[in-house]
């Protein structure tokens, strides 16, 4: 019987709801960085080299294979700059595999606006597509196992929900969104609370329907967390023999998450121990942007 407090769909639903609020704010902040602190396409002095009434058609092409992500951010960039004056034609959707030299979308509208929004739009789509592409690679390495890939809170400041959305597009799943939707009890929480049991019992009392996860560093701490009734137990820097022993001891009474020393080389080995989740901070912390470019036609 799965732990009663944990529903893996809750985090996805919460993210998709919150992101509707976050996208306009994130785009506005990015545009203000380019436009002297305000969202005004007229502040782009280089774009003023073109006549105001010049119309243009542009294409955005990927230079390498990957997974596309960022459609709504691109749309929001041009909505904020020019309302409905820019028309976007999409050839892909978020989560689609893309291939080198493929046209992913086209733009038609005022040339000044296309140039002003180019870098901001590409910054979002290259970053998010880069994350989605790496996640898809990791998910492929887990094929045939029962282990699910999770992200973490190790995200670029200001882009938490965007990066976690990219993880979903790549086929991964979300760990907690922040500090309000799940308990994650670590060493210092335990010391301050007095014991694992006291910390877990207090968490259940405060928020009975919120999942409680406990991080452990050895098998004795695992036993304590299990006896306390933790929903999820995070195995921090366990070796594979310890992971197998943890799976045996828990025997389905809680879910097990592996964290620490996870790379593309170790991922499969860790999954084959039988753990439920592997969380990888590098997915949203060490971001390699996918190579896309915009060209006027």
UniProtKB/Swiss-Prot annotation:
Name the record gives this protein: Nicotinate-nucleotide pyrophosphorylase [carboxylating]
EC number annotated for this UniProt entry: 2.4.2.19
Binding site for substrate: 119, 152-154, 176, 186, 215, 236, 259-261, 280-282
Lineage: Bacteria, Pseudomonadati, Pseudomonadota, Gammaproteobacteria, Enterobacterales
Pathway participation: Cofactor biosynthesis; NAD(+) biosynthesis; nicotinate D-ribonucleotide from quinolinate: step 1/1
Subunit structure, interactors included: Hexamer formed by 3 homodimers. Homodimer.
One Gene Ontology cellular component annotation held by this UniProt entry: cytoplasm
Enzyme class: transferase
Modified residues (Blocked amino end (Pro)): 2
Pfam families the UniProt entry points to: QRPTase_C, QRPTase_N
Claim: Glycosyltransferase is one of the keywords in the record: yes
Catalysed reaction equations from the record: nicotinate beta-D-ribonucleotide + CO2 + diphosphate = quinolinate + 5-phospho-alpha-D-ribose 1-diphosphate + 2 H(+)
InterPro entries linked to this entry: Aldolase_TIM, NadC, NadC/ModD, Nicotinate_pribotase-like_C, Quinolinate_PRibosylTase_N_sf, Quinolinate_PRibosylTrfase_C, Quinolinate_PRibosylTrfase_N
GO molecular-function terms, A-Z: nicotinate-nucleotide diphosphorylase (carboxylating) activity
Keywords tagged on the record: Glycosyltransferase, Pyridine nucleotide biosynthesis, Transferase
Domain of life according to the entry: Bacteria
Its job: Involved in the catabolism of quinolinic acid (QA).
Database matches in PANTHER family: NICOTINATE-NUCLEOTIDE PYROPHOSPHORYLASE [CARBOXYLATING]
Entry-linked SUPFAM superfamilies: Nicotinate/Quinolinate PRTase C-terminal domain-like (SSF51690), Nicotinate/Quinolinate PRTase N-terminal domain-like (SSF54675)
Family: Belongs to the NadC/ModD family.
GO biological process, one term: quinolinate catabolic process
